[in-house]
Amino acid sequence: MELTKAWAKENNVELTFVDDQLTMDNIHLVEGHDGLSTSQNSKVPNEAYPILKEFGIKQIAQRSAGFDYYDLEEAKKHGIIISNVPSYSPESIAEFAITSTLNLVRKTRQIEEKTKEHDFRWQPAIRAGLVNEMTVGVIGTGHIGRVTAKLFHGFGVKIVAYDIYQNEEAKSFLEYKDSIEEVVAMSDIVTLHAPATKDNFHQFNNEMFKKFKPSAYLVNADRGSVVDTKGLIKALDDGLLAGAALDTYENESLFIPKDFSDKEIDDELFLEVLNHEKILFTPHIAHYTDVSVRNIMQIALKSVLEVLETGDTQNRVN
């Protein structure tokens, strides 16, 4: 909040802060403003666009790299530019993906649970593998995927990857394969870094998990929709893979980022995720560092000003 206020003062802009995301219940609060920026993690209803147009809004600046919460054509039809923050701190997410991997492989949660019970024995259940001896599969080699691969490269691992658009620079530290299935079959760790699209919805389903090594781990600091949660839980229960670290959940918008410490969670699937012994869940927090928060805010609000002053922005996605 202080960073945002400082930006507003520096740029002579008046800001109104709303705690919630944009919904049909609070859309009336936009009236009287020249620009709009939101950190959406639920779909913007199509009926919102004509209302925003009526309010004189010409853009929505999404404060994240992902923009799958918007109907881009519908927004464009009403003269509304959608922008994103294509790269704000890939290092933040990459470091978290590495951290999640280490927590899985080194069985941190199991060790913590034993320690809290004052059971300090060295047992086979907490004996770990060695990342250095593993093959890492990176799905998606955009900004975040490449940084993640570089960090893994520092462990001395073999890195295989899949992306529709291969990056020449990345070929110096990873090897591209012709399909996701080929990457999965070779990998001890599979880390996801592809944008959410209609084509990759539930791409990682039970059938895909059948191609995993039984000893392999899945790390998703990407988008929840890429993973079929029911399929993942079944695969874990059936021993198709050893564990998963999820920083996102396909129906998370009902819960994240909100405080449910004194509320009941009425999503049985989410409860299964939270309680599953082979899943490490974190609340979409991989990006949440001082650097990324500052960059997200500054880049998104700069996009608002660009549209207001020039009619367009370099971060436009529609």
Write out the residue ranges for each language-model feature.
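Phosphate-binding beta-alpha-beta segment of Rossmann-like dinucleotide-binding domains, i.e.
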Residues: 78-135, 147-150
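Short, conserved active-site loop motifs that form the nucleotide-linked donor/cofactor pocket
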Residues: 13, 80, 174-175, 278-280
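Rossmann-like dinucleotide-binding domain for NAD(H)/NADP(H)
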Residues: 215, 221-318
